[in-house]
Swiss-Prot record:
Higher taxonomy: Bacteria, Pseudomonadati, Pseudomonadota, Gammaproteobacteria, Pseudomonadales
The protein's name in its UniProt record: Hydroxymethylglutaryl-CoA lyase
List of residues binding a divalent metal cation: D13, H204, H206, N246
EC number: 4.1.3.4
Source organism (scientific name): Pseudomonas mevalonii
Domain Pyruvate carboxyltransferase: 4-271
Keyword Lyase: yes
Length: 301
């Protein structure tokens, strides 16, 4: 049975796009619950300005309160050397950096060009290598940009390759606005797999147009075996009106297990976490599988 790695991004990418910020204690509790389901890769926070992203305030406290010997890799997003040093002080052993495949998105999101963004986080890669801290890379807008429209697959592959050559062990290709279709996804990953090992690629799909699970299936067919997901489908994109969150972890697990892949994650346990966090945030549970499991559980009890 082939294994697929599920990378849970709800506590960071999910929560930072929800209107209601959670306390440090609530975020630590959520992460602990997710780890208890068998998830072994969890994005726990971001060392960014609380002025711009108040939902991630106190990420240093969150990281410090997480166990260091439970077999789970807790990752934090860092935009620059300053953020990296803060993550390092908090005991973080894996960080993530992000770039965009679209010049327009890069300028609107982080106020610099793609080349300038690489100048910002190249020192992070250098310092992380010296400290034996792993670095994951994100590429935004791989299947479309909210400002400039279509994005050439060649532009995505170029950015992904640069991240890989700088030392990122894994490159997550993100459909930030959730507009991609399976045919485009297949073409993109086929092209990128010519530039760097497919084992170093991950899929990160938003569900704005209902294509996230279909895109996961298309990426699986191209040999991709790592996918980002968010419990209860938490999240969105502030630059894309109406954008939904990431593909729900529950929906991803339902697909993967049904296709015969092993994940080491308990689907029903994740669904229970999804119900609880949705209620806590006062938001709708966006996971189809999660809602179906909750309805079945209600009937049985």
């Amino acid at each position: 049975m082939q294994a697929v790695k599920v990378f849970e991004v709800g506590p960071r990418d999910g929560l930072q796009n929800e209107r209601q910020p959670l306390s440090v204690a609530a975020r630590v509790g959520l992460i602990g619950e997710l780890a208890g389901t068998g998830l072994r890769h969890i994005e726990a926070g971001a060392f960014v300005s609380p002025r711009w992203v108040p939902q991630m305030a106190g990420s240093d406290e969150v990281l410090r309160q997480l166990p260091s010997n439970d077999g789970v890799s807790y990752t934090a997003l860092v935009p620059n050397r300053q953020g990296f040093e803060a993550a390092q002080r908090a005991g973080c052993r894996e960080v993530a950096v992000f770039a965009a495949a679209s010049e327009a998105f890069s300028r609107n999101n982080i106020n610099c060009s793609i080349d300038e963004s690489f100048e910002r986080f190249t020192p992070v890669l250098r310092a992380a290598n010296e400290a034996s801290i792993r670095v994951r890379g994100y590429v935004s807008c791989v299947l479309g940009c909210p400002f400039s429209g279509a994005v050439a697959p060649e532009a995505v592959a170029k950015v992904a390759r640069r991240l890989y050559e700088l030392g990122c062990y894994e490159i997550s290709l993100g459909d930030t606005i959730g507009a991609g279709r399976p045919d485009e996804t297949a073409q993109l990953f086929e092209l990128c797999a010519r530039q760097l090992p497919v084992a170093a690629l991950a899929g990160h799909f938003h569900d704005t147009w209902g294509m996230a699970i279909a895109n996961v299936h298309a990426a699986l067919a191209q040999g991709v075996r790592t996918f980002d997901s968010s419990v209860a489908g938490l999240g969105g994109c502030p630059y894309s009106p109406g954008a939904s969150g990431n593909v729900a972890t529950e929906d991803l697990l339902y697909l993967l297990h049904g296709l015969g892949y092993s994940t080491g994650v308990d689907l029903e346990a994740v669904a229970q976490v999804g119900v609880r966090i949705s209620a806590q945030l006062g938001t709708a549970n966006r996971s189809r599988a999660g809602l179906a499991l909750a309805a079945r559980s209600a009937r049985e009890h």
